[in-house]
């Protein structure tokens, strides 16, 4: 039997999804209506939040992911688990087991800290919709800390819109780069974007090598999951060798 379990959505998207669910006679479990989540605190080790539903009493949980939106993602996961267990006639997982599982969550490339000194954070935000909550999380977690953003994206993404978003982040500087991939912007295209927005353009390998040796600010590497698939192993390898 099909089911529909949804997070908070724009009204139009919600209507479409719930309309399809009704057509397919799929029971609907919806954020706010059937379960609620409230962020309690954000730490460098994750998020603390309260969760309540018709199936569970209100309780606090912690998820080992940065970004305030991850509390909602964790709440959605709890709801899915509870609906599936109930459908199969199984006893719901205890609060302690759920909390233990959330403590062990790892999501490479999603506000992932890959170096502590200097602090380097990776996030695959690759469109304006994803950049907005990332910026909100950075403002919340690092309100007064100086930040450097190393950014690139692939050709199918909204480069101009994301550049404007990043330039609005306080206490930060934006640096552009590109990478070897047929989907990536060319060196010339990135140079043109850097010139238009009066930004620095760098070779990412050289930049990261220098940063690991001399960097003293928070560095966020972002813009493309394809880009991070090259950056992440590079950083982890050099971090391990150091």
Task: Report each predicted region and the residues it spans.
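A conserved short coil-to-beta-strand element within the FAD-binding core of flavoproteins
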Residues: 33-42
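Short, small-residue-biased leader/transition segments that mark boundaries at the very start
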Residues: 1-5
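Short SAM/SAH-binding signature in class I
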Residues: 76, 216-225
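C-terminal helical cap/extension that packs against the catalytic core
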Residues: 10-29, 45, 119-120, 128, ...
């Amino acid at each position: 039997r099909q089911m529909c379990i949804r997070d908070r959505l724009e009204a139009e998207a919600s209507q479409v999804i719930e309309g399809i669910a009704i057509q397919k006679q799929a029971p609907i479990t919806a954020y706010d209506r059937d379960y609620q989540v409230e962020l309690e605190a954000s730490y460098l080790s994750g998020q603390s939040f309260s969760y309540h539903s018709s199936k569970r009493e209100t309780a606090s949980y912690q998820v080992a992911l940065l970004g305030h939106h991850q509390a909602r993602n964790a709440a959605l996961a709890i709801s899915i688990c509870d609906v599936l267990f109930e459908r199969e006639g199984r006893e719901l997982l205890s609060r302690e087991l759920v909390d233990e599982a959330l403590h062990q969550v790892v999501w490479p490339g999603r506000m992932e800290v890959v170096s502590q000194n200097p602090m380097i954070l990776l996030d695959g935000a690759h469109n304006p919709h994803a950049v907005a909550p990332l910026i909100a999380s950075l403002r919340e977690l690092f309100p007064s800390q100086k930040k450097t953003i190393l950014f690139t994206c692939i050709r199918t993404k909204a480069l101009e819109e994301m550049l404007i978003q990043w330039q609005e982040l306080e206490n930060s500087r934006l640096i552009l780069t590109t990478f070897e991939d047929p989907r990536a912007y060319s060196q010339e295209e990135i140079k043109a974007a850097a010139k238009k927005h009066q930004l620095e353009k760098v070779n990412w390998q050289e930049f990261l090598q220098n940063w690991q040796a001399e960097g003293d600010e928070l560095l966020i590497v972002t813009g493309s999951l394809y880009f991070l698939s090259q950056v992440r192993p590079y950083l982890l390898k050099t971090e391990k060798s150091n």
